[in-house]
Amino acid sequence: FPKDTKALKYLANQHGYQLKTVEAAVDVNSTQKTRLYEKACQRMITFQGLKAAVLGLAFKPGTDDLREAPSLDNVKLLLEGGAQVMAYDPVAVTNFEKHYPEGANEKGSIFYVDTVEEALSGANICFIFTEWQEIKNVTPAAFKKLMKNPLVYDGRNVFDVQAMKEAGIE
């Protein structure tokens, strides 16, 4: 867990120790946060004007905790790229909105929706950052039906890759 490794690194430094393995883990955790966005950049020419569904804002299901949540860094990059972000999370929206108020942000915009289906409706691309049950309940066929372009980056391995491909989702 990123919070634990950062705390361990801090404590070691306070006592004059350098834990290289822990420091490496902290570095890897940091770069992993935007891995999905980086993968999407290899595929997309631009995010300007694209509708991006973001499913899950919290660090993990069952909490509204945003500390170390990959959604924070990725939404920032999407907004800077000019995307219209449709964000869904059953409990973390209030906390997330403190970082990104609804409406115009950076070069893009963000809107908070009440259902996964609302987020997916007409989306060009989808990012999954938290494995909420509400997200798991959506079928691959629903992604295909609702999205304008069914391109999904599943950061929590919620869905079976083969089942998604068979449904026509990239």
Placement of each model-derived feature along the sequence:
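Structural/interface elements that position substrates and couple domains in central-metabolism enzymes
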Residues: 1-170
